[in-house]
UniProtKB/Swiss-Prot annotation:
Cellular component terms per the entry's GO annotation: cis-Golgi network; cytoplasm; endoplasmic reticulum tubular network; excitatory synapse; Golgi apparatus; lipid droplet; postsynapse; protein-containing complex
Quaternary structure note: The Rab3 GTPase-activating complex is a heterodimer composed of Rab3gap1 and Rab3gap2. The Rab3 GTPase-activating complex interacts with DMXL2. Interacts with LMAN1.
A single GO BP: excitatory postsynaptic potential
Gene label: Rab3gap1
Phosphoprotein among keywords: yes
Name of this protein: Rab3 GTPase-activating protein catalytic subunit
Record flagged with keyword Oxidoreductase: no
Domain of life: Eukaryota
Length: 775
């Protein structure tokens, strides 16, 4: 193409000679073949589970990255902004326009449309479970675990009543953990199951690492706090998302179910693993093995409900384990400690009562009776009465009766109060051992609130509500009375609620200033609940009181709740944990790349998720928005890594060049078009040039041999065919001139013509101006 004076002819220039025409040319070259820069990301292989690795990632962590190169094309625009007409030749045979010599280079990247990103796909597929309606039984086939269990219990009911002996289990392993469960499952599901044994055992070992220990399980929970900074950040997230700590069993279970759902069995695999998990929970409850990966203490209401339920079950196991361990203590030893040899001489009835109480205490604190025997409250009371009868029989020969009753002896003391003494007898005030409050999950608290609200605002309803809420108060009063014989309500209030005992200085008859105290106004209200409870309370130490927390009943409620969960319910419970894990993953990956725009999006994701996940049953649309944001971040990070690999940022020998390249890559991610500093002679320009050269050489090697044989030596022919750049995908020209129009004496005005030529298209556009004065 030889540049001519098209603008002058178009505008009908009346001048001779014609004014000069300025030409700007831009050629665009497209790079699609990246050659050695292939995309290495491969989908995880579930078979690698058994080896402890999945897709090159540590098992238990979500995978990350795109399965295809997220950068599909690179567009290089070489620009000659100021050329003079008549000196440039550009045609099919020859061209003066060498891209390497162009003074300006700019680059655009074309992104792959919706690249498959592993993390986004994992979370999206897990969300789909929430929309399923099937129950676990419908998915796996009707199970009769419970029916077989009932038959076995009924068959051995009498033997359990007459021979209450704990089953000795010295070591727990994966094999005996799931052996019985697998036998029962196979009866109803056939020999094939969604998860094979290797995968299942690996997952169970990951969830329950204590099962692999050669030592007997001591039931201690293990929480890894090796990284305090990370733990602090994670605390903020799980608190905001209402999920679970990242080292907890609930969090690990969510990751396992997410991976199984995506790669191994889908919904069936999820149902299978969940059923195994529930069986494991019952096994641990029945055999007093604490659940690992759960913080000790009452349920954490900041976590998801499923995590709270597992913590509640752990609390039940702790209480049951304490009772069973207490039961192993020999009767003679415990009686010697609690009942001195000369106690019976002081009064036979007191001795008998004390022995009965001691026996009852052992029944409370150390009861094993297999798993079912304390499954209902009436069973527990009957067993306690049986022990009372046994105690009566043993002590029937002792002398004494009601007339020989001795003064009450203090029981259940924790330690002496530092300052206070009893008001009536001046004895030191002792702080009693009290029962711990019953742990509660958020759904139990809601139920309790509903019951209390239904009592209404009447006087009777208010009184009943107060009595229901004062069970713990009554227990503490009884413990206080047992620890402090001769005490009064004022003594209890001074310890339990000091602000309700008002002291003031007064002058006595002798003129001395003394302290005089009295109960507060609210304690003097008629029919005060505290006064009623104090009058009702008997001096009974905590160890002999009726339990505030029936661990057996609560454990069975939790196990029933777990067994009734459908996969959709389970996914709803665990989705906050999965999103929590996904956010932690993108934060971890972003920290390696340091992309400012991604940091901003992650903050938006956290803020959005905190609002959505704090409430039960969030809308699917809002959840999808969160997942879309996570996928967007994943794609941006994948693009950054793709560009860094292509431009070889890690191979730079000079730190300055490396920083320039990283800045260039960052701009490519965030801007539609980026200028190349130094054009073809700069560091980035040389890399781009090399990319095109490699692609051209590969294209020449792939040419058919027939074309190489047409003329001359193959090597010579190949050399003539190979150029550094392919033919331009697009040619753009802008012709500019300043011409007086429409008359020679008109004002000289700018004239512009634009043309673009591609393989499929040719466009021509002009912008011409005329002097309108006097015309």
């Amino acid at each position: 193409m030889a540049a001519d004076s098209e603008p002058e002819s178009e505008v009908g220039c009346p001048l001779t000679p014609l004014p000069p025409v300025s030409i700007a040319i831009r050629f665009t070259y497209v790079l699609q073949d990246w050659q050695q820069y292939f995309w290495p990301q491969q989908p995880p292989d579930i078979d690698a589970l058994v080896g402890g690795e999945v897709g090159g990632l540590e098992f238990g962590k979500l995978p990350f990255g795109a399965c295809e190169d997220p950068i599909s094309e690179l567009h290089l625009a070489t620009t000659w902004p100021h050329l003079t007409e008549g000196i440039i030749v550009d045609n099919d045979v020859y061209s003066d326009l060498d891209p390497v010599q162009a003074p300006h280079w700019s680059v655009r990247v074309r992104k792959a449309d919706n690249p498959q990103c592993l993390l986004g796909d994992f979370v999206t597929e897990f969300l789909k479970i929430c929309r399923r309606k099937e129950s676990t039984d419908e998915i796996l086939g009707r199970s009769t675990f419970e029916e077989e269990g009932r038959v076995a219990d009924i068959t051995h009911a009498l033997s359990k009543l007459t021979e209450p002996a704990p089953v000795p289990i010295h070591k727990l392993s994966v094999s005996n953990m799931v052996h019985t469960a697998k036998k029962k499952i196979r009866k109803h599901r056939g020999e094939e199951s969604p998860l094979n044994n290797d995968v299942l055992n690996t997952i169970l070992l990951f969830l329950f690492p204590d099962a692999a220990s050669e030592k007997p399980l001591d039931g201690t929970t293990s929480v890894d706090n090796s990284n305090p900074a990370a733990e602090a950040g994670d605390y903020t997230l799980y608190n905001q998302f209402k999920s679970a700590p990242s080292d907890s069993l609930t969090y690990k279970l969510a990751l396992c179910l997410c991976m199984i759902n995506f790669y191994h069995g889908g919904l069936k695999g999820v149902a299978h693993l969940w059923q195994e998990f529930v069986l494991e929970m019952r096994f641990r409850w029945e055999n007093n093995f604490l659940i690992p990966g759960l913080a000790s203490g009452p349920p954490d209401l900041r976590c998801c409900l499923l995590h709270q339920k597992l913590q509640m079950l752990n609390c039940c196991i702790e209480r049951k384990k304490a009772r069973d361990e207490g039961k192993k203590t020999s009767p003679s030893d415990s009686m010697t400690k609690a009942y001195p040899a000369d106690a019976g001489k002081a009064g036979g009835q007191l001795g008998l009562d004390h022995l009965r109480d001691t026996e009852k205490e052992k029944g409370e604190a150390g009861k094993s009776w297999d798993s079912w025997s304390d499954s209902e409250e009436e069973f527990f009371e009957c067993l306690s009465d049986a022990e009372d009868l046994r105690g009566n029989g043993q002590e029937s020969t002792k002398k004494g009766g009601p007339k020989d009753m001795a003064p009450l002896k203090p029981e259940g003391r924790l330690h002496q109060h530092g300052k206070l003494t009893l008001l009536r007898n001046g004895e030191p005030l002792y702080i009693p051992v009290t029962q711990e409050p019953a742990p509660m999950t958020e759904d139990l608290l809601e139920e309790q609130s509903e019951v209390l609200a239904k009592l209404g605002t009447s006087a009777e309803g208010a009184h009943l509500r107060a009595r229901m809420q004062s069970a713990c108060l009554l227990s503490d009063m009884e413990s206080f009375k047992a620890a402090n014989p001769g005490c009064c309500l004022e003594d209890f209030v001074r310890w339990y609620s000091p602000r309700d005992y008002i002291e003031e200085e007064v002058t006595d008859e002798k003129g001395n200033v003394v302290l005089k105290g009295e109960l507060s106004a609210r304690m003097k209200i008629p029919s005060n609940m505290w006064v009623e409870a104090w009058e009702t309370a008997k001096p009974v130490p905590a160890r002999r009181q009726r339990r505030l927390f029936d661990d057996t009943r609560e454990a069975e409620k939790v196990l029933h709740y777990l067994a009734m969960q459908k996969p959709a319910d389970l996914a709803r419970h665990l989705l906050p944990c999965v999103i929590h894990a996904a956010v932690l993953k993108v934060k971890e990956e972003e920290s390696l790349e340091n992309i400012p725009s991604v940091k901003k999006i992650i903050k938006q994701i956290i803020a959005h998720s905190s609002k959505v996940l704090r409430f039960p049953s969030p809308e699917d649309k809002k959840l999808e928005e969160i997942i879309l944001q996570i996928t967007t971040v994943e794609a941006i990070i994948a693009r950054a890594r793709s560009l860094k690999a292509k431009f070889g940022t890690e191979k730079c020998e000079h730190e300055e060049e490396k920083e320039d390249l990283e800045r260039f890559v960052s701009c490519l991610l965030e801007q539609p078009e980026v200028a190349v500093t130094g054009a073809g002679r700069g560091h980035a320009g040389r890399i781009i040039h090399k990319l095109f050269v490699n692609a051209q050489r590969a294209a020449a090697v792939a040419l058919p041999e027939e074309e190489l044989k047409r003329s001359g030596c193959p090597e010579e022919r190949r050399q003539t065919l190979v150029s550094d750049f392919p033919p331009p995908a697009g040619r753009e020209l802008i012709l500019r001139a300043t011409v007086p129009r429409p008359a020679p004496y008109s004002k000289a005005l700018p004239q512009r013509m634009y043309s673009v030529l591609t393989k499929e298209d040719f466009r021509l556009a002009g912008a011409f101006s005329s002097d309108t004065s006097f015309f």
